[in-house]
């Protein structure tokens, strides 16, 4: 029997951080048809503070990857708070990963793998891996 995403979260002992409040005039989530669009998320820690730093200057690529994973946990917390039920999510369709990095940093796909690997672990290989863009923001 296939495990539900909520069961996988418990099995791999993940803790979701608090869902952040909107920092401007936007909806954290919008449902259109059978698609759920989620506004940009940051890497919120369990204590509610943000992970900060620029990859290639303050953070290594590996630390950036951990921050991208934390963005995934923050996104799941936002879904749970506003949508109530993570198990209603059927698949990841598209990921736009934006890496706060130096101009010289080029390992954006490696960093965003932190997010993608988490989604795969929660939703499974078939449904947790979608289309993806990984870009750097300086």
Predicted features by range, described:
Residues 1-138:
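Short, polar/acidic, helix-capping and beta-turn segments at strand->helix junctions
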């Amino acid at each position: 029997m296939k495990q539900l995403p909520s069961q996988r979260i418990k099995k791999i002992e993940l803790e979701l951080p608090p869902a952040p409040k909107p920092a401007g005039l936007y909806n954290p989530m919008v449902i259109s048809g059978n698609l759920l669009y989620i506004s940009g998320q940051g890497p919120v820690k369990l204590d509610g503070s943000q992970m900060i730093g620029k990859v290639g200057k303050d953070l290594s690529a590996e630390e950036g990857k951990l921050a991208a994973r934390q963005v995934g946990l923050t996104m799941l917390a936002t879904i749970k708070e506003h949508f109530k039920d993570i198990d209603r999510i059927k698949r990841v369709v598209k990921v736009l990963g934006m890496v706060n990095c130096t101009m010289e940093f080029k390992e954006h796909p490696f960093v965003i793998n932190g997010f993608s690997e988490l989604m795969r672990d929660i939703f499974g290989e078939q449904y947790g891996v979608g289309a993806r863009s990984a870009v750097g923001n300086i």
